[in-house]
């Protein structure tokens, strides 16, 4: 080269370096271009422009030596004189450019038309993501109504699933054979409810306006008398939603229907954990839930003779007894010789009773008119001692 032969005294005078600084830079520049040529990759234009300028400068120096001062050839090298704001060129163009940001660099050859090797070429592109298109294309699962109907048909049980045509979401009611876990607690009504016809089940499931609210927590639909308009007893339906709560409390609708047939008498709820003396006696007494009812909410409205009605009316008028329950002095009227008669007529040990309710009076469930008096008595009966907790309604005469 021309610069290699010109002015060697700068480095040769000391006998240490055979080339000057500018000559060494030119050699590095030419070696970098040779690497690009050997790897078969196109040479960047930044490496070619300094060669053109140096060629023009050398030709100018040959014609007019005055242009050699000041030393301008050192300013013409691309990566040093022109590219101050640019990145340094790759010293090894055919090598994979994957680095760790420090000294390490991949030693493999770069893939054709790429900066990286086959191992590092697709890094960071194919992430593990869930295919959204596949989840959207899957068909929706069959509805609960169709599944319940199919299972009932295969099991040989008449399907009683009902759905609503309103825009609200549909609810389905389990089949009667799904009520097996409840038979241990509720007894007769559930055991007898499995023998219902499909027509009767469909009727009870359609006439009730509270169908959507109650079917979700109870295996059987509410009875047909829920379709009546009971404005003052609307609170009673909310308590029915709690599982098993109707074994202790009842709503005003049941009381009113019972008093329509039984007058001012009281009716008893089912016992919990006790067994009747006779196997033929239903779990619910005659004045409570009917064991042949189509729903656990149904009440056995059997007709009682006139003597029974008069006896119950006299019982309410003659009862008077003091009892301390929960630290309060609560008073209840009770006849003296009624304990043995009640124990003989009602062999079940009832846990909760309910006060009689007048049909024409305004109900007092949540602290309305009237007073509520409770008493606990331990009558001395012929059999083992039944403990009865009675909740009655006291009417001011």
UniProtKB/Swiss-Prot annotation:
Task: For this entry, list what GO says about its biological process.
Answer: developmental process; DNA-templated transcription; regulation of DNA-templated transcription
Q: Name one GO molecular function term.
A: ATP binding
WRC domain spans which residues? 90-134
User: Any idea where this protein resides?
Assistant: Nucleus
Region described as Disordered: spans on this chain: 117-176
Q: Name one GO cellular component term.
A: nucleus
Motif Bipartite nuclear localization signal location, chain numbering: 86-105, 123-130
Which residues are listed as membrane-spanning?
A: none
Q: What is known of its domains?
A: The QLQ domain and WRC domain may be involved in protein-protein interaction and DNA-binding, respectively.
User: According to its UniProt record, which protein family does this protein belong to?
Assistant: Belongs to the GRF family.
What function does this protein fulfil? Transcription activator that plays a regulatory role in gibberellin-induced stem elongation.
Q: Can you name this protein?
A: Growth-regulating factor 1
- As recorded in Swiss-Prot or TrEMBL, the protein's gene is named GRF1
């Amino acid at each position: 080269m021309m610069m290699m032969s010109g002015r060697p005294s700068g480095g040769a005078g000391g006998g240490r370096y055979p080339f000057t600084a500018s000559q060494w830079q030119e050699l590095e520049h030419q070696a970098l271009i040779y690497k690009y040529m050997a790897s078969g990759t196109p040479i960047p234009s930044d490496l070619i422009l300094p060669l053109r300028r140096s060629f023009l400068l050398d030709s100018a120096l040959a014609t007019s030596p005055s242009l050699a001062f000041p030393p301008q050839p050192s300013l013409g090298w691309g990566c040093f004189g022109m590219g101050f704001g640019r990145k340094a060129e790759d010293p090894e163009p055919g090598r994979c450019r994957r680095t760790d940001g420090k000294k390490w660099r991949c030693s493999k050859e770069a893939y054709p038309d790429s900066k990286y090797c086959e191992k590092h070429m697709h890094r960071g592109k194919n992430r593990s993501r869930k295919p959204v298109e596949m989840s959207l294309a899957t068909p929706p699962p069959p509805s609960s109504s169709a599944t319940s109907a199919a299972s009932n048909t295969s099991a040989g049980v008449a399907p009683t699933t009902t759905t609503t045509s309103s825009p609200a979401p549909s609810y389905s009611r389990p089949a009667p054979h799904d009520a097996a876990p409840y038979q241990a607690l509720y007894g007769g009504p559930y055991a007898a409810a499995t023998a219902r016809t499909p027509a009767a089940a469909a009727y009870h499931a359609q006439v009730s306006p509270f169908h959507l609210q109650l079917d979700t927590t109870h295996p059987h639909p509410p009875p047909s008398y829920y379709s009546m308009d009971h404005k003052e007893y609307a609170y009673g339906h909310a308590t029915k939603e709690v599982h098993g709560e109707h074994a202790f409390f009842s709503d005003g609708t049941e009381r009113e229907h019972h008093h329509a047939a039984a007058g001012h008498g009281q009716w008893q709820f089912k016992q919990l954990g006790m067994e009747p003396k006779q196997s033929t006696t239903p779990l619910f007494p005659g004045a409570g839930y009917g064991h042949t009812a189509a729903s656990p909410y149904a009440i056995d409205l059997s007709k009682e003779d006139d003597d029974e009605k008069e006896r119950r009316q006299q019982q309410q008028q003659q009862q008077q007894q003091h009892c301390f329950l929960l630290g309060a002095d609560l008073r209840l009227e009770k006849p003296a010789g009624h304990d043995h008669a009640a124990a003989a007529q009602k062999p079940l040990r009832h846990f909760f009773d309910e006060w009689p309710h007048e049909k024409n009076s305004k109900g007092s469930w949540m602290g309305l008119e009237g007073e509520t008096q409770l008493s606990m008595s331990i009558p001395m009966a012929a059999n083992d001692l039944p403990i009865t907790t009675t909740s009655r309604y006291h009417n001011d005469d």
